[in-house]
């Protein structure tokens, strides 16, 4: 893997583009809710809903669920019978991966590139 800095190039300049929402996906990445300062009731209701969403998606596409170290064992247990959900231990700030994780762009050859959006918590960082 090679890191390309913004000073070297941009995805658009290199012929990469955001695939359509209906385009086939290799997998879906999700983050396990854990922040008790933003999720009510110790994040348990949110975890239940995220599990339901992951299971629905996994009927069609593999899901990679990222859980922090403290919640990893619990998350792994939740999905122990779900063969199309892979739980990965990863430090995350929040479960909202649209803001905090990479998104992927493609080119006409099918190559992929991950974008880092430099998210700053809506000015909070």
Segments predicted by a language model, with ranges:
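The feature marks the mature, well-folded catalytic cores of soluble enzymes
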Residues: 1-125
